[in-house]
Design a protein with these regions (language model features):
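A short, structured loop/turn motif at beta-sheet edges
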Residues: 1, 24-28, 59-63
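Short aromatic-glycine-(Arg/Gly/Cys) micro-motifs in beta-strand/loop hairpins
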Residues: 1-16
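C-terminal structural segments of small proteins and small subunits
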Residues: 46-83
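A short, exposed loop/beta-hairpin motif centered on an aromatic-Gly-Thr core
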Residues: 16-24
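Surface-exposed loop/edge segments in extracytoplasmic proteins
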Residues: 14-17, 63-65
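Charged, amphipathic alpha-helical segments
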Residues: 30-43
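Short linear motifs in intrinsically disordered
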Residues: 1, 40-49
């Protein structure tokens, strides 16, 4: 099994994975990245109207996978103005 590192991005904040996780294959890497991204989204959304979350995976040397989630709330009906 190979060791992969899952770095997490929340807009401009970066949390680097310096421990890594051993994975059997690329399917396992994709599954862990997706679960990590879903967990991050559950923790931080909806705290902003727009947010970019990502999990970038590398093997210590080379990039392997990028997973992105972009959340944007688009207000279609503005709040009424008060005088």
């Amino acid at each position: 099994m190979a060791r992969y590192f899952f770095d997490t991005y929340d807009d401009d904040q970066i949390i680097e994975d310096d421990i890594g996780t051993e994975c059997e294959d690329l399917d396992a890497v994709k599954a862990i990245a997706a679960l990590s991204l879903a967990e991050l989204a559950r923790e931080v959304l909806p705290s902003n109207i727009k947010r970019h979350l990502a999990v970038n995976v590398h093997d210590g040397t080379n990039p392997v996978l990028e997973s992105h989630l972009i959340f944007e709330a688009i207000i279609r009906k503005p709040e009424p103005l008060t005088a």
